[in-house]
């Protein structure tokens, strides 16, 4: 659970909204919390804070659509 909380914290920082911590199933793109520039910022933050490199080609909005799904994808990449 600690890893997920770390991921949620990074997403909240990039989105500038703690709602992602409170509701990890929120659709961050549909709700306007993250856009294409935010996506790049998120991937850079993930790499710098978690040491996980996510190629932009691996980032599919339909798969990486909620904080929970992002945490699950990153856990598989660790």
Curated annotation (Swiss-Prot):
Residues where O-(pantetheine 4'-phosphoryl)serine is found: 36
GO molecular function: D-alanyl carrier activity
GO biological process, one term: lipoteichoic acid biosynthetic process
Domain of life of the organism encoding this protein: Bacteria
Keyword Hydrolase on entry: no
Subcellular location: Cytoplasm
InterPro entries named among the record's database cross-references: ACP-like_sf, DltC, PP-bd_ACP
Keywords annotated in UniProt: Cell wall biogenesis/degradation, Cytoplasm, Phosphopantetheine, Phosphoprotein
Domain Carrier: from-to ranges: 1-78
Transmembrane stretches, start-end: none
A GO-annotated cellular component: cytoplasm
Keyword Cell membrane recorded: no
Biological pathway: Cell wall biogenesis; lipoteichoic acid biosynthesis
PROSITE patterns: CARRIER
PTM annotation, UniProt: 4'-phosphopantetheine is transferred from CoA to a specific serine of apo-DCP.
HAMAP family per the UniProt record, alphabetical: DltC
Biological role: Carrier protein involved in the D-alanylation of lipoteichoic acid (LTA). The loading of thioester-linked D-alanine onto DltC is catalyzed by D-alanine--D-alanyl carrier protein ligase DltA. The DltC-carried D-alanyl group is further transferred to cell membrane phosphatidylglycerol (PG) by forming an ester bond, probably catalyzed by DltD. D-alanylation of LTA plays an important role in modulating the properties of the cell wall in Gram-positive bacteria, influencing the net charge of the cell wall.
Family the entry assigns: Belongs to the DltC family.
Name by which UniProt lists this protein: D-alanyl carrier protein
Gene symbol of the encoding locus: dltC
């Amino acid at each position: 659970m600690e890893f997920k909380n770390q991921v949620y914290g990074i997403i909240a920082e990039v989105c500038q909204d703690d709602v992602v911590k409170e509701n990890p199933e929120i659709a961050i793109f549909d709700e306007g919390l993250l856009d294409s520039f935010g996506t790049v910022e998120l991937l850079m933050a993930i790499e710098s804070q978690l040491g996980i490199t996510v190629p932009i080609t691996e980032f599919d909005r339909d798969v990486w659509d909620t904080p929970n799904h992002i945490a699950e994808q990153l856990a598989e990449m660790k």
